[in-house]
UniProtKB/Swiss-Prot annotation:
GO molecular function: ATP binding; UMP kinase activity
Similarity section: Belongs to the UMP kinase family.
Superkingdom in the source lineage: Bacteria
Broadest EC class assigned to this enzyme: transferase
Localisation per UniProt entry: Cytoplasm
Subunit: Homohexamer.
Main location: cytoplasm
Entry's Gene Ontology BP terms: 'de novo' CTP biosynthetic process; UDP biosynthetic process
Protein name per the record: Uridylate kinase
Record-listed UMP binding positions: 52, 72, 133-140
């Protein structure tokens, strides 16, 4: 069972909210931090992208008449808040962590510089990439894909509420069928909403595998990182 050298972990903003639908649950963040810390302690280099949907969603705001660009910028700032929360939890465990923001805010986070990010990873620091791509109209899934490609990660670890990719939402349809593996093209052609089309296409074009797994099962981040077969592989 071979593990990975470097992973990019994609967490939704909702993952930090715990049982709530909004905000940040400190206990949940600490629990996630412990799992990520265990992976880093095993020698695997870890980059993280956190969404911002527990605080603000630009797309939803645009649907309610707010300017889409303004909404997306607000969503990017929400990811910075989440990134700082996760960073704080990790630092309190003694894990060296760096938050790197695509939007410069020097008092809060380092500016994102690719070579510096790679150097942090090589030194064993966890790097949390904040503020998306800094551009509106791009999701944090796309930001995760971009950062994974830039740092030459071996895989994108997409943590979700379900244990893989299904032909339809298993939380709504008990008869949903799980795919142990699936191609990028089939994800796109079926319109499966595991990640947005831009990020799937980028992974396809660059042959970057995605593993979709259940974040709510304790230990799954480590299992996935060590190469254990869990969830669904998109390749």
């Amino acid at each position: 069972m071979a593990g990975y050298k470097r992973i990019l972990l994609k967490l939704s903003g909702e993952a930090l909210a715990g049982a709530a639908t909004f905000g940040i649950d400190a206990d949940r963040v600490r629990s996630l931090g412990r799992e990520v810390a265990d992976v880093a302690a095993s020698g695997i280099q870890v980059g993280v992208v956190v969404g911002g949907g527990n605080i603000f969603r630009g797309v939803a705001a645009a649907a309610r008449s707010m300017d889409r660009v303004t909404g997306d910028h607000m969503g990017m700032l929400a990811t910075v808040i989440n990134s700082l929360a996760l960073s704080d939890a990790l630092e309190q465990m003694g894990i060296p962590t760096r938050v790197m923001s695509a939007i410069e805010m020097h008092q809060v986070a380092e500016p994102y510089i690719r070579r510096r990010a790679i150097r942090h990873l090589e030194k064993g620091r966890i790097v949390i990439f904040a503020a998306g791509t800094s551009n509106p109209y791009f999701s944090t899934d796309t930001a995760a894909t971009l950062r994974a490609l830039e740092i030459k990660a071996d895989v994108i670890a997409k943590a979700t509420r379900v244990d893989g990719v299904y032909d339809k939402d298993p939380l709504k349809h008990p008869d949903a069928v799980k795919f142990p593996e699936i191609s990028y093209l089939e994800v796109l052609s079926r319109g499966l909403g595991v990640m947005d089309a831009t990020s799937i296409a980028m992974c396809r074009d660059n042959k970057l595998p995605i593993i979709v797994f259940n974040l709510n099962t304790i230990g799954n981040i480590m299992r996935m990182s060590m190469g254990e077969t869990i969830g669904t592989v998109i390749h």
